[in-house]
Amino acid sequence: MARNDIRPIIKLKSTAGTGYTYVTRKNKRNNPDRISLMKYDPVVRKHVEFREER
C-alpha cells in the first residue's frame, strides 16, 4: 500500500472565520469521519475548533 492511502494529508480550517489552517495527517482506518480539534488560532489569539476540510 502507498503511504498516502492510509494516512492522507488533511487541512484543518478554523471555525472562527479567520481562514487560518493547520496541515496534518490522519489515519483513515481509525478515523473515517471528519475530525475536529481544539487548536490555537493566532489571528483571534484564542483556542477555537478546527474542522477537517475536504
Swiss-Prot record:
Q: Where is the signal peptide?
A: none
UniProt cross-references to SUPFAM superfamilies, sorted A to Z:
Zn-binding ribosomal proteins
The biological processes this protein is annotated with in GO are: translation
Domain of life of the source: Bacteria
Q: What PROSITE patterns would the database entry show?
A: RIBOSOMAL_L33 (PS00582)
Q: Which GO terms describe its molecular function?
A: structural constituent of ribosome
Tell me which GO cellular component terms the UniProt record holds: cytosolic large ribosomal subunit
Instruction: Tell me the Pfam families matching this sequence.
Output: Ribosomal_L33
Q: List UniProt keywords, sorted A-Z.
A: Ribonucleoprotein, Ribosomal protein
InterPro entries for the chain: Ribosomal_bL33, Ribosomal_bL33_CS, Ribosomal_bL33_sf, Ribosomal_zn-bd
* PANTHER family per UniProt: 54S RIBOSOMAL PROTEIN L39, MITOCHONDRIAL, LARGE RIBOSOMAL SUBUNIT PROTEIN BL33M
Q: Which family does it belong to?
A: Belongs to the bacterial ribosomal protein bL33 family.
What name appears for this protein in its UniProt entry?
A: Large ribosomal subunit protein bL33
- What does the organism's lineage look like at the top? Bacteria, Bacillati, Actinomycetota, Actinomycetes, Mycobacteriales
